[in-house]
Amino acid sequence: MDTALPVERRIDDLIARLTLTEKINQLLHENNAVERLGVPAYNWWNEACHGIGRNGRATVFPQVIGLAATWNRDLIARVAEVISDEARAKHHAAVAAGRRGQYQGLTFWTPNVNIFRDPRWGRGQETFGEDPVLTGELGAAMVRGLQGSHPRYLKTAACAKHYAVHSGPEQDRHGFDARPSQKDLFETYLPAFQRLVESGVEAVMGAYNRTLGEPCCASSLLLGDILRGRWGFAGHVVSDCGAIDDFHQHHRVTRTAAESAALAVKMGCDLNCGCTYHDLVVAVREQLITEAEIERSLRRLLRTKFRLGLFDPPEQVPWSGISPEIIDSTPHRALARQAAAESMVLLKNNGVLPLRRDLESLLVTGPTAANVSVL
């Protein structure tokens, strides 16, 4: 753990000290601590679609479909920078208090750059809309704001999801086989992901569905030929939560959890959101996968952790001194207000706007009018 050594040397040293079981645990989204080596516990699952999610008070920005309506790359980058400031403040406060659970890490499964082609899709508000170019440009701006520009450290790690051809409906996603034409695949569904890879996104999340017959989290086409081959992606790939189980439970491309885990890792899915990778112990015993193949994925994940400064003293890591006082602060709320104002598109007025200045009260109505978590 000598911080003076090059990162790759430190990764080599750590991998050499881990047992097979410890290596496999590091490929699950909920990492146990390796106390004998001073490796802390870490949970990879965190969300920041339009502000830090599910972790207490935070500045709430407009939904992503609203941010897309601003057409403002600089604004999106500033929004993401505020999110990453608050993320660092929350993370370091949590670690200081001995809390390392879900939603307290620095790896955010954001942004969602799927194409919102059908308005019936219930998660379309998470996306930047139906246009691949706009989605790519604004998604890249969000990556820039989340990850920062430090030459050694990532401020937080962004993740392009859900790769690929994943645009609803939710009910069918665990067994659906998307079969786009080559033209539609490369002109509609993939350009935004390519743009985020070019912008340096640290992670890519594989989708639940199959694309052209292969599960996205074990696709030789998507993960091998395109993502790492043509685009040169060097970060890590994470499965959507429970997606590896779908291999044998719904897609029926494997028979057992061990076969599913082995197939996913061999095809390049490094991190399992779920628990299927526990069966890699069985997969090694049954000679479905080698320890070297497991170490290839482990190396990518450790590289992300080192880039986040998770193995370095706090005083050596930029942003470790950000005060929790900045969370949901007046300047951050002002930026959220600006983003909301720029997101609004007036389609019809009928003389209602601008509102009279002498109004004493306004009625906000609807099923979620008082639901802050939804808004």
What positions do the PLM features span?
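Glycoside hydrolase catalytic-domain context in secreted enzymes
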Residues: M1-L375
